[in-house]
Amino acid sequence: MPAPFEKGSEKKGATLFKTRCLQCHTVEEGGPHKVGPNLHGIMGRKSGQAVGYSYTDANKKKGVEWSEQTMSDYLENPKKYIPGTKMAFGGLKKPKDRNDLVTYLASATK
């Protein structure tokens, strides 16, 4: 079972985003979709709902509402959490890294 989310370091999360996520995602309002969707406004949104992005049926049907905890659970092992997702990222195994990244995402995607 994934570790409970605990607020982490936004600064360390920003660094993780730049090194592990930026090649496929943007976070700013109106930012473009890349290989993965723009993440602006993701917290509180259901999976597979970013307008203009072509999701797999698995992402659309999962129906998870993104929160700090669900995002942390997903980022531990995306392909296990949503079998059939096209997200190629293998996941962040360390709870601290997930906490830092999710803390950054919660702030940067508002």
From Swiss-Prot:
Gene3D superfamilies: Cytochrome c-like domain (1.10.760.10)
Gene this chain is encoded by: CYC1
Zinc-finger listed as a keyword: no
Pfam families listed in its UniProt record: Cytochrom_C (PF00034)
Name under which the protein is recorded: Cytochrome c
Binding site for heme c: 21, 24-25, 87
An MF annotation (GO) of this entry: heme binding
Family (UniProt): Belongs to the cytochrome c family.
Post-translational modification: Binds 1 heme c group covalently per subunit.
Role played: Electron carrier protein. The oxidized form of the cytochrome c heme group can accept an electron from the heme group of the cytochrome c1 subunit of cytochrome reductase. Cytochrome c then transfers this electron to the cytochrome oxidase complex, the final protein carrier in the mitochondrial electron-transport chain.
Keyword Iron: yes
Species the sequence originates in: Scheffersomyces stipitis (strain ATCC 58785 / CBS 6054 / NBRC 10063 / NRRL Y-11545) (Yeast)
InterPro entries on file: Cyt_c-like_dom, Cyt_c-like_dom_sf, Cyt_c_1A/1B
SUPFAM superfamilies tied to this protein: Cytochrome c
PROSITE patterns hit by this protein: CYTC (PS51007)
Residues that bear N6,N6,N6-trimethyllysine: 79
Keyword annotations from UniProtKB, A to Z: Electron transport, Heme, Iron, Metal-binding, Methylation, Mitochondrion, Respiratory chain, Transport
GO CC entries: mitochondrial intermembrane space
Subcellular location: Mitochondrion intermembrane space
